[in-house]
């Protein structure tokens, strides 16, 4: 999941070197924290949060297929 999220985020932003994903495992599953450069935040979130919602949907769908629970948090 982490690699998929990195791939998607790096292809959306102008500064792909600033993209990082931190994976945290807790009792409810995995949390992927996505960090991007401040100037790229709008590109990852999108108009009315549409891109962020689609990123979360894709990751959640792939995780469910693999029997996992994964959530994505976009942090600044």
Regions found by a protein language model. Give the residues of each.
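RNA-contacting regions in translation and RNA-metabolism proteins
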Residues: 1-43, 53-76
């Amino acid at each position: 999941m982490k690699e998929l999220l990195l791939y998607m985020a790096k292809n959306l932003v102008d500064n792909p070197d600033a993209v990082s994903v931190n994976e945290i495992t807790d009792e409810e599953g995995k949390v992927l924290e996505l960090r991007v450069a401040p100037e790229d935040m709008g590109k990852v979130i999108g108009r009315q949060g549409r891109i962020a919602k689609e990123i979360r949907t894709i990751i959640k769908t792939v995780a469910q297929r693999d029997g996992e629970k994964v959530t994505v948090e976009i942090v600044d």
